[in-house]
Curated annotation (Swiss-Prot):
Record's compositionally biased regions (Low complexity): 1-17
Summary of subunit composition and partner proteins: Heterooligomer composed of large and small subunits.
Pfam family, one: Exonuc_VII_S
GO terms classed as biological process: DNA catabolic process
Gene: xseB
Protein name stated in the entry: Exodeoxyribonuclease 7 small subunit
Length: 93
């Protein structure tokens, strides 16, 4: 049932940082990216993934994290513009 490392590597989904037809597409929304990232973290933390899938998962996670951070930064920039470039303090109840 164990695969050789060469066949395991060839069966892994490639994840590339640049535009690549074989790389998974980025989610359409922050929420979708966050949901995928949370599921990925759970699978990575389970300790049940083979090494090649751990690497692919880590790479995908880094891609999703960058997407989420970029979206948050874009929204923060828009809020700054709407608020006159100065954010109001966040009041927690």
């Amino acid at each position: 049932m164990a695969k050789s490392s060469a066949s395991s590597l060839s069966s892994a989904k490639p994840v590339a940082a640049g535009p690549d037809a074989s790389a998974p597409a980025l989610p359409v929304s922050y929420e979708a990216a966050l949901q995928e990232l949370e599921g990925l973290v759970s699978r990575l933390e389970s300790g049940q993934l083979p090494l090649d899938q751990l690497l692919a998962g880590y790479q995908r996670g880094a891609q999703l994290l960058k997407f989420c951070r970029d979206r948050l930064e874009a929204v923060e920039t828009q809020i700054k513009v709407l608020e006159g470039t100065e954010l109001k303090p966040w009041l927690q109840a």
